[in-house]
Amino acid sequence: MSGNKEEEDPRIHGIKTKIRVVPDFPKKGIMFQDITTVLLDPKAFKDTIDLFVERYRDKNISVVAGIEARGFLFGPPIALAIGAKFVPLRKPKKLPGETIFEEYELEYGNDRLEMHIGAVEAGDRALVVDDLIATGGTLCAAINLLERVGAEVVECACVIELPELKGRQRLKGKPLCMLVEYR
């Protein structure tokens, strides 16, 4: 596991073999990296969580922010294991009560991430979790949202990186930890 490149940890190889590639989903020309097949294998799922926990357990992370939807699969078990709170970053109008939001650009239009006001406080040390980084737009929005309330974003963690889309370059200099790189 690395900020830059896959290492030879046999657990990473096991995780990589469980990721299903679905051609032409959700549209023609996309090679969709499906992590749901990792969840079907208890060992691969546990190894995924364990690798992140080993990396973050001694970094004084106080909040794990998971990006909807697949960040919700990996974020909560990481948060529990390292003794941090879990904060869901959701699509618009999915959270009850008062929220704060950050807009970001998509290929065709805009979207936004929301979180509850008061869920993250100034001085919190945050880890942002998602399943995959492609263009980096969603992770960048998450970083901006957390920093706006005074949190320190320590790192972003993703199971998969698609490096040819250069998403890492949009992360405002924040480190990215990924397990599997697809070219």
UniProtKB/Swiss-Prot annotation:
Annotated localization: Cytoplasm
UniProt keyword terms in alphabetical order: Cytoplasm, Glycosyltransferase, Purine salvage, Transferase
Pfam family name, one: Pribosyltran
PROSITE patterns for the chain: PUR_PYR_PR_TRANSFER
Residue ranges of the TM segments: none
Signal peptide: none
Record SUPFAM superfamilies: PRTase-like
Effect of loss of the gene: No visible phenotype under normal growth conditions.
Function statement: Catalyzes a salvage reaction resulting in the formation of AMP, that is energically less costly than de novo synthesis. May contribute to the recycling of adenine into adenylate nucleotides and the inactivation of cytokinins by phosphoribosylation. Possesses low activity toward adenine and cytokinins.
Similarity field: Belongs to the purine/pyrimidine phosphoribosyltransferase family.
Quaternary structure annotation from Swiss-Prot or TrEMBL: Homodimer.
Identification of the protein by name: Adenine phosphoribosyltransferase 3
Organism: Arabidopsis thaliana (Mouse-ear cress)
Lineage: Eukaryota, Viridiplantae, Streptophyta, Embryophyta, Tracheophyta
